[in-house]
């Protein structure tokens, strides 16, 4: 399991990468964005020493997230990404090729509450 903490200006969130029932899932939530559609993209480097300017070129498009009128996005996406290959890279939230927020993807421990959340959502409840 991997996790990315986003904390840039007023944009905050937690994104998990987790295998669930044989499929890799991306899940979490993000707050602080304006209503609309945004891109989740994995970048080459996990270097955030200069914010999102030092994370390198985009490598993998994960998918779109949809921010509601309250500024909240609930993320639940399927992905073909091999989780072990993205550890140490960066995840960005972008719109119109502008990187709005980013964070480094790291290894996470298995949390029973997260597994319960995944199981509930996998079953459509």
UniProtKB/Swiss-Prot annotation:
GO terms for cellular component: host cell cytoplasm; virion component. Keywords: Disulfide bond, Host cytoplasm, Virion. It is found in: Virion; Host cytoplasm. Disulfide bonds join 52-102. Signal peptide: none annotated. GO terms for molecular function: metal ion binding. One of its GO terms (biological process) is superoxide metabolic process. The keyword Disulfide bond applies. InterPro entries: SOD-like_Cu/Zn_dom_sf. Belongs to the Cu-Zn superoxide dismutase family. Superoxide dismutase-like protein with no enzymatic activity. This is Cu-Zn superoxide dismutase-like protein OPG175. It comes from Variola virus (isolate Human/India/Ind3/1967). The gene is OPG175.
